[in-house]
A protein has these predicted regions:
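Hydrophobic residues in well-ordered beta-strands that form the structural core
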Residues: 8, 49, 88, 113-115
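Beta-loop-alpha module in the N-terminal Rossmann-like domain of NAD(P)-dependent dehydrogenases
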Residues: 33, 42-102
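Rossmann-fold dehydrogenase core element
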Residues: 100-118, 134-140
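Contiguous beta-strand/loop segments that form the cofactor/metal-binding neighborhood of enzyme cores
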Residues: 171-239, 254-260, 264
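C-terminal helix-rich "cap/oligomerization" subdomain common to oxidoreductases
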Residues: 62, 205, 255-289
Length: 289
């Protein structure tokens, strides 16, 4: 575990510990006290006081990277070059250029690299997508209120903003269902050089469309609606339905572990993450033009 991120405390530590094919070995943090508190329920795991020492540890096979967005590329590449497989938290990078550099590093190292889009591993979500017949329109929304001014999601240098944080989910699921978009229209409300709210209209071949909406200044909103030949399909909490009853984080960890142990392709290949970042880049550009 690279860093003592809150997502580790809330979901990923338990998922690794419960996985059938993985073991929680160590957490590196520049705040050893915080890391120690997080690892208290996992007495076999060690606190390591530098990221470099974690990457050099021969007992570590896989790095989970939940660092702030602007550090994804640097530390993912450093981990790959150190001979570690990497599960990198979403969004994969700051932009498509960074994503391509990460993918190139993975190829050069011969190690596995996957973006941690856990929602794609939830059995109910997979069943929802697989039962769709001839989808023609997707509406995906994800928003909440970021109240703490010190929240890194509100800091432009750290890759803050609604589009990268929660819009990455809306874009990912739209592309999962409809494929790659053509023309894109978008608008954003900018404050302190970050998008507090972004909305976009994505055009696909065959006159199919997707409406995506992401916000850091709204009441909780998380919905997915798909218009298809068989009718209108809706799913609430498509991105955060944890442990009901299966834990998508654990399923994601086990899937990545299977790829590592058996040298199988990862479920979400780097090419998919590059394509998602490319669409996010295009939405950002369209929203500010």
């Amino acid at each position: 575990m690279l860093g003592a991120a809150d997502i580790a405390r809330r979901a990923v530590l338990a998922a690794i510990a419960a996985s059938a094919n993985g073991r929680l070995v160590a957490m590196a943090s520049r705040s050893p006290e915080r890391a120690g508190a997080m690892l208290a329920p996992y007495p076999d795991a060690r606190v390591i006081e530098s990221y470099e020492a974690l990457l050099a540890d021969p007992k570590v096979d896989v790095i989970y990277n939940p660092l702030p967005n602007h550090l994804h590329k640097e530390w993912t590449i450093r981990a790959l070059e150190a001979g570690k497989h990497v599960l990198c938290e979403k969004p994969f990078a700051m932009n498509a250029v960074e994503a391509e550099e990460m993918a190139s590093a993975a190829k050069a190292s011969g190690k596995h690299l996957m973006e941690a889009f856990m929602y794609r591993f939830h059995p109910a979500m997979r069943a929802f997508v697989e039962q769709l017949r001839d989808p023609i329109h997707v509406e995906a929304s994800f928003g909440f209120t970021a109240k703490d001014p010190s929240d890194i999601r509100l800091q432009a240098p750290f890759g803050g903003g609604a589009l990268l944080d929660v819009g990455s989910y809306a874009v990912s699921v739209s592309r999962w269902i409809l494929g790659e978009p053509g023309e894109i229209f978008a608008r954003a409300r900018i404050e302190r050089d970050i998008d507090m709210t972004t909305s976009g209209l994505l055009m696909f071949d065959g006159d199919r469309t997707a409406s995506v909406w992401a916000s850091l200044e709204s009441p909780g909103a998380e919905n997915l609606t798909v218009v298809a030949a068989g009718g209108v399909h809706r799913r609430e909490r498509p991105f955060t339905a944890h442990r009901d009853p299966q834990d998508p984080y654990q399923l994601m960890v086990e899937s990545f572990g299977d790829s590592v142990l058996n040298d199988r392709p990862v479920a979400i290949p780097p090419a998919e993450s590059i394509a998602n970042m490319r669409t996010l880049d295009r939405i950002r550009e369209a929203s500010r033009s």
